[in-house]
UniProtKB/Swiss-Prot annotation:
Its EC number is 3.1.3.16. This is Serine/threonine-protein phosphatase Pgam5, mitochondrial. It is an enzyme of class 3 (hydrolase). Displays phosphatase activity for serine/threonine residues, and dephosphorylates and activates Pk92B kinase. Has apparently no phosphoglycerate mutase activity. It comes from Drosophila simulans. It is a single-pass membrane protein. Belongs to the phosphoglycerate mutase family. BPG-dependent PGAM subfamily. It comes from the Eukaryota. The chain crosses the membrane at residues 7-23. Coiled coil: none annotated. The keyword Membrane applies.
């Protein structure tokens, strides 16, 4: 009996010590809720349904009372404010270019960059998309890429929207920081505000009167596209530099009528020959010290 009592006391003391250690060091514990709970691990993982400020309930005057007439009014306005079709936004990065001189006017596409843009144009043509809008950054390399693509797709050049909001820049300080690229804080403030304005201009759910799915082609830049992807998917925007996309690659995002956003392609360039796959400026034509 004495041995049994000693064993029980020892077991109890051991369990108590283990439990106290768990309380002191909870971060080492693996909880079942990590994989099995309906609640997200981090509150930031919750989807913001009104991210574009067009969630129907945010646009309609709230119920003033519970009278049937008021409820009918509210439900009718709510239905009228709902989007009914999806928007597809296809983002294309410019082709490889020459980084020579201090002016954008000298940053022409390389011969390889022109071939990349041609392959992308052919790929977009093969997809058989009827484009509702084509938008291009006002920087030379994006303009040249857009011109080459337009020769392959069914869209009039005169209808292209040239947008300065899409110009390349520093959208937000990246995490983790990198040593080889450290813009001044003023550049992040200037470029970040502009690029965010570009995101808000082009990323939103469809208007309620849109009667068919729409397709918008945007020809822009690597930093801007990566930032747009993070913002659209509600990932931490500071993670944009962890993504890598090739020159003239295709990124396809879809905004559903509910406001949910999904990604179909991210930096797709598999339609190009291997010798055309690039993502950096050729060092022999790059402005380096």
């Amino acid at each position: 009996m004495r041995k049994l009592t000693s064993f029980a006391c020892g077991t109890g003391a051991g369990l108590a010590a283990y439990y106290l250690q768990r309380l002191r060091d909870p971060q080492t514990a693996v909880q079942n809720s990590w994989t099995h709970s309906d609640k997200p691990v981090d509150p930031w993982a919750l989807w913001d349904t009104n991210w574009d400020c067009r969630e129907p309930r945010a646009l309609v005057r709230p119920l003033r009372n519970s009278q049937p007439e008021e409820e009918n009014r509210y439900n009718a306005e709510l239905e009228k404010a709902k989007a009914k079709k999806a928007r597809h936004i296809i983002l294309v990065r410019h082709g490889e270019y020459l980084d020579v001189g201090d002016s954008d006017d000298t940053h022409h596409l390389t011969e390889r960059g022109r071939k990349q843009a041609e392959f992308t144009g052919k790929r977009l043509c093969e997809l058989g998309i009827k484009w509702d809008k084509v938008v291009a950054s006002t920087m030379l390399r994006a303009q040249e890429t857009s011109d080459i693509i337009l020769k392959q797709i069914d869209f009039e050049k005169e209808k292209v929207v040239n947008c300065a909001f899409l110009r390349e820049g520093a959208p937000i300080p990246p995490q983790p920081p990198v040593g080889h690229w450290k813009p001044e804080a003023s550049q992040f403030l200037r470029d970040g505000s502009r690029i965010e304005a570009g995101f808000r201009r082009y990323f939103h759910r469809a208007y309620p009167d849109q009667e068919k799915e729409s397709y918008t082609l945007i020809v822009g830049h690597g930093n801007v596209i990566r930032y747009f992807v993070c913002r659209a998917l509600q990932f931490p925007a500071e993670g944009w530099l962890r993504i890598n996309i090739n020159h003239a690659s295709i990124t396809w995002l879809t905004i559903s009528p509910s406001g949910n956003v999904s990604i179909k392609y991210l930096g797709d360039s598999g339609f190009m020959p291997a010798e055309l796959l690039t993502n950096r400026i050729p060092r022999d034509v790059k402005n380096v010290v």
